[in-house]
């Protein structure tokens, strides 16, 4: 399993889930949603059942394990969480295309993630700090 910046979950390079969060303007609260394909997936998507033939992998079992892991993550420092996130990030080193809501498109190499979670993309002209946008993986450092 790998992550695609900022919030997609990948199995073998194919999306099987994602996270979405929305805050009010004052940022006094955040609503977080998680969608994960467990036993079924739309066409061209992956599902967790692809990893195992274990019939005990049901939504309630998965939810219990997810909550346990979230509890473990809550005990970690921000620095350690950042390290773990970056270690599992499939986006790094790849040539990416960032599509912004204003229809602007930028192409460059994903070179890092800053401590605030923003993607660092090196274009031919400069290093950009990306806060939001749709990311398309074009190829990795080896040209794939």
Locations of the language-model features?
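Long, positively charged amphipathic alpha-helical accessory segments at protein N-termini or as interdomain linkers
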Residues: 11-144
């Amino acid at each position: 399993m790998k992550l695609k910046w900022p919030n997609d979950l990948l199995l073998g390079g194919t999306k099987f889930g994602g996270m979405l969060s929305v805050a009010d303007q004052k940022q006094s609260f955040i609503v977080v949603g998680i969608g994960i394909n467990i036993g079924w997936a739309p066409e061209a998507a992956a599902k967790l059942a692809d990893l195992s033939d274990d019939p005990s992998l049901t939504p309630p079992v998965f939810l219990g394990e997810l909550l346990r892991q979230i509890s473990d993550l809550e005990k970690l420092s921000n620095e350690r969480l950042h390290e773990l996130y970056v270690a599992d990030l499939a986006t790094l080193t790849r040539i990416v295309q960032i599509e912004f809501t204003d229809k602007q498109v930028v192409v460059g190499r994903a070179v890092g993630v800053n401590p605030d979670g923003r993607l660092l993309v090196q274009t031919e002209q400069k290093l950009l700090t990306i806060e939001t946008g749709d990311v398309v993986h074009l190829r990795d450092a080896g040209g794939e």
